[in-house]
Amino acid sequence: MPEFYDEAAEQQRPTGDALITSEDPNHPANLIPSLCAKFWTLGWVTGTGGGCSIRDDDLVYIAPSGVQKELMKHTDIYVMSISEQDPNHNKLKQRTYLRSPPCYKPSQCTPLFLAAFTRRGAGCCIHTHSQWAVLVTLLLEAQGPGKDRVFEINNIEQIKGFGRGMTKTGNLGYHDTLRIPVIENTPHEEDLTEYLEEAMDKYPDTYAVLVRRHGVYVWGDNVHKAKTQCESLDYLFQLAVEMKKLGLPWISEVAQIAPQRT
């Protein structure tokens, strides 16, 4: 697990609304509403669904539950400290927050976001309810048991948008196979946490996990990487759905005509 605690930084840390007040457009409390408004135009966070969280060292900024994502303000943001969370308490109601908005509830996605931060050292995690993500899980489901646990696609240029893995350098290449595990949905989002963590353990190089008939979680080292990987993945999901309509396979054999360079 990455180590985030810094005693000196904690002593100098602002409190209350000072945690979410800044003129900097790239401050997490300003960036999350801006990103969610963009995601809403893409159909990723329709009807208050989905969410986004950004980690700044030990501090985690989280979009609330039940808010219309295109109308979110910086004052709607929750803030917590990773180091102050009890690892034995993984339920939403057992979390402690440094700053809470007065009229919302904590996001049910919170423990899943924290899994990306603590297990992957991610700087940002995005959860979407993209229709393309849901359709891909349905297409996998239709293939039957044993063939519905991972989405695989290769020989597509957009695959280059993904890193090779947390402990590896460089990005995937055109001829590489991108693999995204699929987990089953649960009635309550926070109950997905253990299954997401199991998928992370089984697929240590993945930057995303699909949730059947629900959506996808995507993370990255920073906001830029999480956002571009989420965009690339949605592109590939849409492409995969259209390929299936045309009877085209997601896994293909394409001759390599030039050397692979890192």
Swiss-Prot record:
Ranges for region Disordered: 1-24
GO biological process, one term: L-methionine salvage from methylthioadenosine
Residue numbers binding substrate: 109
Catalyzed reaction equations: 5-(methylsulfanyl)-D-ribulose 1-phosphate = 5-methylsulfanyl-2,3-dioxopentyl phosphate + H2O
Predominant location: cytoplasm
One Pfam family named in its UniProt record: Aldolase_II
Note on how the cofactor is bound: Binds 1 zinc ion per subunit.
Active site per database record: 157 (proton donor/acceptor)
Key words, A-Z: Amino-acid biosynthesis, Cytoplasm, Lyase, Metal-binding, Methionine biosynthesis, Zinc
Biochemical pathway: Amino-acid biosynthesis; L-methionine biosynthesis via salvage pathway; L-methionine from S-methyl-5-thio-alpha-D-ribose 1-phosphate: step 2/6
Top EC class of this enzyme: lyase
Function: Catalyzes the dehydration of methylthioribulose-1-phosphate (MTRu-1-P) into 2,3-diketo-5-methylthiopentyl-1-phosphate (DK-MTP-1-P).
Protein name as it appears in the record: Methylthioribulose-1-phosphate dehydratase
